[in-house]
Amino acid sequence: PKDRRVLLDLGHVLQPNWGHKLVGNEYLFVNDSTVEGTIRTQGWAHFHAVSYRITFSEPIETLYQYIDGNLRKDSLFLRLNTPGDLKFHYKFAENNKPLYVKVAISPVDTDGAERNMLAELPGWDFDATRVESAHIWNKALNDIQIESSDPKVMVNFYTALYHTMIAPYAYQDVDGRYLGMDKKVHRAEPG
């Protein structure tokens, strides 16, 4: 493909009409294929932060950054901290290879996101990751089985079962660190 781009929208928030808003955006260009940062919001939760690390399978060729819809002319930066609506367009070299993107998050910090990525997705084998993910979900969804001749009943049941497995959730790093209700970092005991 001639125009290989990825848009990273760090200004989007869910339910802005309910008062959920962006209050901080930290961004770091780690190297030519890795970025990381922390997004801070307020609204449904008084204070909510998500740290992330994003690694591309190829170097970023060109970077365009926008704050509040305006293209910044000084796009050659390493670190940025703004409460503004922050978006990036990453342009990659023209070729026919697939572009892979790995994303990890942390409730604590970018170091946690990096450790989570290394522990949970160390390689670049997309097909193996897809197969492993399908196996994990199939095992979980097959723990309870129902019978019905109505496909709608089956879809409804297994969709509801899937939903029970994604929320509520334990949100912590692979090393057990998490951000408590007191906004301090704690460590969960293994097990």
Question: Where are the model-predicted features located?
Answer:
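Beta-sandwich/jelly-roll carbohydrate-recognition scaffolds of carbohydrate-active enzymes
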Residues: 1-191
